[in-house]
């Protein structure tokens, strides 16, 4: 039986040769309702300030590969993905992450989201960290919106391993993790006051991590690229913007439009 697929990509990306063939190959499995391609970020020499974006997407891609190896990828990115035409659902107009929600609703119907690193979309990094900040805030807001709209997927008794993957990979990242991360400092300070060596060492390591993040921030301001310092900076930068996503979601409630982040020249 012939199955029709709808393939979607972003206007500012370039697909690799053979990407479409790979997506069609993956979709031949009747258990697959969606095929997620890999997003790759191209970093130009003059875009050292946004090197963390490329590192983040390498990490995210590795997680998606492991998710699919376990059972199913947890959502698809709009840069490149495909769905069975028969499974398409119209999203509400105020949806911020329509590609993510659509793909997971397909998974909730019992289909898998296949992940293929052989089909990828190449995109230039954000022009600078200010543009990357805008992107991260709106994606975080979309993630929070998704947690509510996909709340049925939190039921592990119904969705089993898919629910576990969704909660561990997405829900915790968009809800508890940023709050817990910044609550750790005062908690570790209190524990260190007990005089226990272990707590003192943990506090020192945490402060060192924050210091590296601050140094990464200062170097970013000077457009100096240093991965050792930029990784802790980008990690903290991401979690701060998740918290900012709460206010963004409240401010833009009822609208799914947003200002696109400016990208560097590819």
Predicted features and spans:
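Conserved nucleotide-sugar donor-binding
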Residues: 77-90
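Loop-to-transmembrane-helix entry motif
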Residues: 66, 70, 170, 174-178
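Catalytic donor/gating beta->alpha subdomain of glycosyltransferases that bind UDP-sugars
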Residues: 27-59, 94-98, 103-169, 234, ...
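Acidic donor-binding/catalytic loop of UDP-sugar-dependent glycosyltransferases
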Residues: 9-26
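Short, small-residue-biased leader/transition segments that mark boundaries at the very start
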Residues: 2-7
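Membrane-proximal intrinsically disordered regions of secretory-pathway and membrane-system proteins
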Residues: 257-266
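Membrane-embedded multi-pass helical conduit in multi-pass membrane proteins
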Residues: 123, 173-254
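The conserved acidic donor/metal-binding loop of glycosyltransferases
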Residues: 8-14, 92-94, 106
């Amino acid at each position: 039986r012939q199955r029709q697929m709808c393939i979607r990509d972003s206007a500012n990306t370039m697909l690799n040769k053979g990407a479409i063939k790979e997506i069609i190959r993956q979709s031949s499995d009747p258990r697959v309702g969606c095929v997620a391609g890999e997003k790759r970020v191209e970093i130009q020499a003059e875009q050292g300030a946004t090197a963390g974006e490329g590192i983040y997407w390498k990490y995210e891609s590795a997680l998606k590969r492991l998710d699919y190896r376990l059972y199913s990828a947890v959502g698809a990115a709009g840069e490149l993905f495909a769905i069975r035409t028969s499974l398409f659902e119209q999203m509400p107009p105020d949806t911020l992450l329509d590609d993510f929600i659509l793909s997971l609703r397909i998974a909730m119907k019992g289909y898998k989201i296949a992940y293929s690193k052989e089909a990828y979309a190449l995109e230039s990094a954000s022009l600078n960290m200010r543009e990357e900040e805008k992107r991260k805030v709106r994606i975080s807001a979309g993630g929070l919106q998704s947690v509510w709209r996909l709340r049925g997927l939190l039921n592990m008794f119904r969705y089993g391993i898919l629910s576990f993957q969704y909660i561990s990979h997405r829900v915790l990242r968009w809800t508890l993790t940023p709050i817990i991360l910044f609550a750790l400092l005062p908690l570790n300070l209190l524990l260190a006051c007990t005089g226990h060596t272990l707590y003192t060492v943990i506090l020192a390591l945490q402060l060192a991590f924050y210091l590296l993040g601050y140094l990464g921030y200062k170097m970013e301001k000077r457009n100096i690229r240093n991965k050792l310092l930029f990784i802790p900076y980008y990690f903290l930068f991401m979690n701060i913007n998740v918290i900012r996503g709460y206010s963004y979601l409240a401010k833009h409630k009822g609208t799914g439009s947003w200002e696109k982040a400016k990208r560097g020249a590819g």
